[in-house]
A protein has these predicted regions:
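Hydrophobic anchor at the beta1->P-loop junction of P-loop NTPases
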Residues: 7
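The conserved Walker
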Residues: 11
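Conserved glycine(s) of the Walker
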Residues: 14-15
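Active-site signature of alpha/beta-hydrolase-fold catalytic machinery across serine-
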Residues: 21
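Active-site catalytic microenvironments for nucleophilic, acid-base chemistry
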Residues: 25
Length: 75
């Protein structure tokens, strides 16, 4: 797993709950409500779990290749 983790998905899918568990288990900091892929590309730091409602899978694939990206959805 890469040192920067991004969890994306629609509101209410459990992103923040998952991020809290991962951050605690891995001893990473949590950054909730990341505004955009461009902001994250410029400002991201290692050993952090980031959460976003607004970043799409396509944006993450293009801009955030050095992240482990987890996409969460309702079933």
């Amino acid at each position: 797993m890469k040192e920067k983790i991004l969890i994306i998905g629609r509101p209410g899918t459990g992103k923040t709950d998952l991020a809290n568990v991962l951050a605690e288990l891995m001893n990473y900091d949590l950054v909730d409500e990341v505004p955009s892929a461009q902001w994250l590309f410029v400002n991201a730091e290692p050993r952090k779990v980031y959460v976003s409602n607004s970043i799409t899978k396509a944006e993450a694939t293009v801009y955030l290749r050095n992240f482990t990206v987890i996409a969460v959805s309702n079933l």
